[in-house]
Regions:
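AMP-binding/adenylate-forming catalytic core of the ANL superfamily
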Residues: 211, 235-318
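Conserved pre-ATP/AMP-binding loop-to-beta segment of ANL
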Residues: 38-55, 88-90
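Conserved ATP-dependent adenylate/AMP-binding module captured primarily in the ANL superfamily
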Residues: 1-39, 74-93, 113-123
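AMP-binding/adenylate-forming
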Residues: 67-75, 91-141
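Conserved ATP/PPi-binding loop(s) of AMP-dependent carboxylate-activating enzymes
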Residues: 193, 202-230, 250, 260-262
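Conserved AMP-binding A3 loop
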Residues: 50-78, 85
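Gly/Ser/Thr-rich phosphate-binding loop
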Residues: 138-190
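Conserved C-terminal "lid"/linker of ANL adenylate-forming enzymes
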Residues: 282, 294-296, 308-351
Length: 351
């Protein structure tokens, strides 16, 4: 008889070492220990099939709790290793936090290769564009390690073509990745779907994905994670050229800066409720951050005060990089924020 009793959900302590996390993750995957929550959770139990619970990345939006099964996590690792032609005994290095799926994926991949995480002389690692930029411009030690690696996965945010060219010119074998927590992280490598991954681009340009690494559900959310044909409908827009997927941006008001999602509408609403000045945010391309957050207002304001208020409320990733004061905020004919027109103004001011 199949055991359908709930499984304990254990919140991974911040003080745990990588060795402790790996031990707990091993038991979560093979079913001999509790499921693990890699972030704040409102739950203490989950269905027995669930191995880990991950918060969706986000500093201004409300994170959802994504429930992932062991078969999904292992399918993701297997597909990644097949693409990378990885072999048992090769090593991964962890350069990302474990409260993001990309960090946990590194641990799962190491376990599937039968090795421990190493800090140097690694074969593979996963980073965000900001880390790659800093390696090329500031961090000689990291740069040396990346150049020696067989492959360096870069995802979590859009990477500029200039940064990609610079990295490859420096002899770093960059593999660009696209995915999300709901698909166990990256499932598109160098614009190509990993094994078992299916891609659609709907009529409105919205990307839809499905595959064996798909998440089971959002905890505490009524309704399915996917549609009736098990397609996960993303908030990203893109197009297909043959078998390759090209992502061109978001369909909502979110941006990704330094690997963190930021809701522009949430940020604006908070500031506009706190001040008599009207604020509007937007983003411009950045080789270091992927996208740099910008903030404009209809009057003058204390920039340092605003930065500190945003930092306390939403965290460091949501602090704007550029400011414009006492300007007219552009709007569409329907009265909605025209963020693209505002971004054009910032690009002229901060080329």
């Amino acid at each position: 008889m199949v055991n359908k009793s709930p499984r304990e959900l254990f919140k991974v302590p911040a003080a745990w070492s990588i060795t402790q996390i790996m031990a707990g993750l091993t038991k979560a995957l093979d079913g001999t220990g509790p499921a693990l929550a890699f972030g704040p959770s409102n739950f203490t139990q989950v269905d027995p099939e669930i191995a880990i619970v991950m918060p969706t990345s986000g500093s201004t939006g409300v994170p959802k709790e994504v429930a992932l099964t062991a078969p999904a996590l292992l399918a993701s690792a297997t597909a990644a290793h097949k693409y990378l032609q990885a072999e048992p005994g090769q090593h991964w290095s962890l350069l990302l936090p474990t409260n993001h799926i990309a960090g946990v994926n590194v641990l799962v991949r190491a376990l599937s290769l039968g090795t421990q995480i190493v800090e140097s002389n690694f074969d593979f690692t996963s980073i965000v564009p900001t880390q790659l930029y800093r390696a090329l411009h500031h961090d000689a030690k990291l740069l040396d390690s990346l150049k020696k690696a067989e492959a360096v996965l870069v995802g979590g945010a859009a990477i500029s073509l200039d940064l990609l060219d610079e990295a490859r010119s420096a002899a770093i074998n960059v593999v660009t990745t696209y995915g999300m927590t709901e698909m166990c992280g990256g499932c598109i490598y160098n614009n190509e779907p990993l094994g078992g991954v299916e891609v659609q681009v709907r009529s409105e340009g919205r990307i839809a994905l499905r595959g064996p690494m798909q998440a089971r559900e959002y905890l505490g959310v009524n309704g399915p994670l996917a549609d009736e044909e098990n397609w996960f409908i993303t908030n990203d827009a893109g197009y297909l050229a043959g078998e390759k997927l090209f992502v061109i941006g978001r369909t909502d008001d979110q941006i990704i800066s330094g690997g963190e999602k930021i809701s522009l509408e949430t940020l604006d609403s908070h500031l506009n409720s706190e001040y008599d000045v009207e604020f509007m945010s937007c983003a411009i391309p950045s080789p270091e951050w992927g996208q740099s957050l910008c903030l404009a207002a209809t009057n003058y304001f204390n920039i340092e005060e605003i930065k500190e208020k945003i930092r306390r409320k939403f965290g460091n990733p949501a602090v704007p990089k550029f400011f414009l004061e006492n300007v007219e905020l552009p709007r569409t004919s329907l009265g909605k924020p025209d963020r693209q027109k505002l971004a054009n103004k910032f690009e002229m001011m901060y080329p």
